[in-house]
């Protein structure tokens, strides 16, 4: 019966997402190295690169997950990081997207990823000019027979962490901090709100957007206002901006270790970001995380390209059933009762 409710709730989520409407941190524009090769060859000849959005590969979120997937693929297939294997190009601002993608093409990479919906136009532009190169865009849909579009069912995982938040909250006030307001981030918000309301219709969900994926100070300011208004849980889908939410939660926990205050992480298991020590005792403000397996998707599509099965012109969507969306394995702050209820959905 619960699974039926989940299906109905998700239908409402998609509708809500339409009505309502990953994620990075700032670093210098650079690359790990540059490489080359011919398209669709064996592991020894195959090369692959990715272009980040304005976040770095150490953003503890979306871009980092993609890079970890590329690293895992390279190591699994005996590729070297550098001129003959796998590589990343880091973007410092929007103007770097086309430049970095073109640089990857000039270095003859067989497959070039654009990490994040902000790179959609740049990928389409360069892909149209280079029909013999394979491209993939993450979190968006781009046109072109040589472009694979990788998307996720973010509303599914957001619904589950919403259930957890709705059952965990003591104040019935919950916050959501999004990065740039868009159809994509609205999927997170709508799914989360639906999950909360499914188990706790009395809870209020305050949905706000920072307008930036790369502004930790803005995230901290927003979190301070939400926690100050009585929220005890905030879910962020804001990339590097979300790091500020963790900072504020940890500061408040440092001031009052007995206060129940939590953050729900995104994209990766962000338990490590919530860890702190007060008076020699260890605490963690991460309630759970909505894990979006960008790393898995990058590995999958890279392998298909290497095996001459590149899904150009296709939309590949990852959800719970495809093992592309899940709730984090680190669940120390959730009771077994709450975990059982989440599992029912």
Label every model-predicted segment:
Residues 18-22:
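C-terminal motif of bacterial Sec signal peptides marking the signal peptidase cleavage site
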Residues 25-29, 33-345:
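A residue-level marker of the well-folded mature domains of exported/periplasmic proteins
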């Amino acid at each position: 019966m619960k699974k039926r409710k989940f299906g109905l709730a998700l239908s409402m989520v998609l509708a809500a997402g339409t009505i309502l409407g990953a994620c990075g941190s700032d670093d210098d524009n650079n690359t790990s190295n540059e490489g080359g090769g011919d398209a669709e060859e064996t592991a020894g000849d195959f090369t692959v690169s990715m272009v980040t959005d304005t976040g770095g590969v150490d953003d503890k979120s979306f871009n980092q997950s993609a890079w970890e997937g590329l690293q895992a693929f390279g190591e699994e297939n005996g590729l070297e990081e550098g001129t003959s294997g796998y590589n990343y190009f880091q973007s410092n601002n929007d103007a770097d997207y086309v430049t970095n993608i073109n640089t990857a093409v000039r270095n003859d990479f067989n497959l070039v990823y654009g990490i994040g919906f902000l790179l959609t136009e740049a990928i389409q532009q360069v892909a149209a000019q280079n029909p013999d190169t394979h491209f993939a865009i993450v979190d968006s849909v781009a046109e072109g027979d040589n472009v694979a579009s990788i998307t996720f069912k973010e509303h599914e995982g957001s619904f589950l962490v919403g259930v957890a938040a709705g059952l965990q909250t003591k104040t019935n006030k919950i916050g959501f901090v999004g990065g740039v307001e868009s159809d994509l981030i609205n999927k997170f918000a709508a799914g989360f709100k639906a999950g909360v309301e499914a188990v706790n219709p009395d809870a209020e969900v305050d949905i706000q957007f920072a307008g930036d994926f790369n502004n930790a100070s803005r995230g901290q300011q927003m979190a301070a206002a939400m926690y100050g208004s009585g929220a005890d849980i905030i879910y962020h889908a804001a990339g590097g901006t979300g790091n500020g939410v963790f900072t504020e939660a940890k500061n408040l926990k440092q001031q009052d270790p007995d206060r129940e205050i939590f953050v729900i992480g995104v994209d990766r298991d962000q338990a490590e970001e919530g860890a702190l020590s007060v008076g020699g005792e260890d605490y963690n403000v991460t309630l759970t995380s909505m894990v979006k397996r960008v790393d898995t998707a990058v590995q999958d599509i890279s392998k298909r390209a290497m095996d001459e099965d590149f899904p150009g012109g296709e939309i590949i969507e990852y959800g719970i059933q495809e093992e592309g969306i899940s709730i984090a394995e680190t669940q120390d702050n959730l009771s077994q009762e709450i975990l059982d209820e989440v599992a029912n959905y």
